[in-house]
Amino acid sequence: MKPQLWDSAAGSALPFWSAEQLQEAWESRHDLKEVADGCRLNVLSAIQHAGSGHIGTSFSSMDIFIAVRKFLQGDRFLTGDSLEQIFFSSKGHDAPALYASLHSGGELSDAQLFSLRRLGGLPGHPETVTPGVVTNTGSLGMGISKAKGFAKAQRLRDPSSRQPVVVLLGDGELNEGQVWESMPGAVKEGLGEVIAIVDSNGIQSDTWTHHTLPMGDVVARASAVGWHAVECAGNDPDEVLSALEEARGDSRPSFIVARTTKGSGISWMEAFPENGAYYQFHSGALAVPLYDQAASELINRFGGGSPNEGVTSAEPVLVLDPYSPKARPTSMVSIWENMLVDVMEKNPLVVALDGDLSYDTGTHIAREKFPDRYIQSGIAEQDMVSMAGTLALSGFIPLVHSFATFLTMRATEQIFNNASEESRVIYLGFLAGLIPSAAGFSHQAVTDVGIMSSIPGMRVFEPSGAEEFHWCIEQAISHPGPSYIRVGAVAPVVSGREGIHRVNRVIEGGATALVSSGPLLTQQAIESCTVLENRGFPVPAVYSVPEITNPFEAWEIDELRQYERVIVLENHNSARAKHFQLSSQLASNDLNIHRLGLDGLPANGQPAEVLEHHHLDAQSIAEAVARLAGEGFLPTAKIESDSETYTHRESH
């Protein structure tokens, strides 16, 4: 049987198995493992087409998805019937595996499968806009609580209902306290229909779970609070199916620890030494030679072929180093990873805390150089923040690292408590703002400015480049109270400026000033000047403002008074930032102040299409400048002013 081919944007054809081919294979051999391997090829190609996604955990959990589908559908397995019972993945990283399982049953089309991480397509983490997805996930720890709610709702509608509610968790997710908070209540309520499966592949974002945050005997812990708790071989779908059937026959809620291998299905993805520091296949599309090798192995295995038939070597065609991080282009994170080392060398009171994101937040170099002043907290943001609070009370300067959305929303109460002690804790929130957008809104921090600016004494920063980053960390260390630094995931704006202030002019301009914070919108503002110049329009001035929340000083107000209008660009949805401050401080003046920013939930997709969707790309900013100046030229941007909101769209 030959796979189908999907044309990628790069011009290459990506192999995949259609739902009909998967159904044909099942009807011929009734081999769940074969169906799972067929879905692995679809996961691999969908991620390759998207350019990003989580391969390792999708491969480790693929057998579980297929086993659960068989458990819930029985004889209707892969018949195209909708999955009526409730099953969802709490960890969310395995969304490609979820989509592949839905596609295998005909619930998602081929085109939908290859719309992964595109605007209007399949979200990077599960959302209810997708057929077959019953709840939004991606923020860890909520799964069992959500499953309890579904089970209780079923009973309220039909007191005799005991339809299984199955939730898949990650073993790293077990770091989150909510998982363990949720378990006793399921026993108290007698919710025997709740079945939790743990994809226990042993590896978190960078390395082994027992090196990150050892969780002990989780089977014994679940059993101790009254759950039916068992283990099984998670990459054997028949064993998983047997464990599910055993759970169905037990009156207690069930906790199944499925022992899996991260990257299961590809020999060299499975190989990771005990002392390995960086698992190479946690996220991201593969280099083309690796993709071709992995696809060949999966294609030849499907239909009863030899696992390595047609594959020249069981070793990867490219050398992969499990002891070194992946190379990455210059970014705000790469700037910080060296700056953090410098800060810790100069100040022995600085302590770095990390939430299982040492590579993604740039703490990995400091971890090796200063192991005594590096604390790996795992995926336990509330614990990390409270620990930082008492470190600060004891005279140290804790620097708390996590993704901005998890840090600021999960640990808000702990952050507030620390602030009430007027202690100096510095929070660094990564992936801040609209971009990266492919992972979906669970990972896009657009509420963080509103949250952190409401904390008493909190200073909020967002540097646009290396010079401003140095200024921000100096300001934060000298500030006696708490500080929050948003760290964008895009390339820094290179300015070459030596003197950094709270308001920095990047480009000289005419009657309009664009004011922004951070690299994303500062760069779009700079590029909008090129768009305007190429069209013969006056170029606006561009200002970068690295501190978001403090009111403007008198000289800064005077600086902006020279312009006829000011447009504030905001990479968040807070009403408490620069547009609000300017509107308040200049209310008695005739200065026209406008805002281009976010409202509501951010869109999911590739960066360029998401920026355009929110009218925050260079073209939209240029059109807003021209429109407000009365110059016309096909306006499409949504512009907020003090008095009203204008929505301009191109007409034909």
Language-model features: locations:
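Structural beta-sheet core signal
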Residues: 167-168, 196-198, 352-354, 400, ...
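Residue(s) in the substrate-gating loop at a strand-loop-helix junction
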Residues: 171
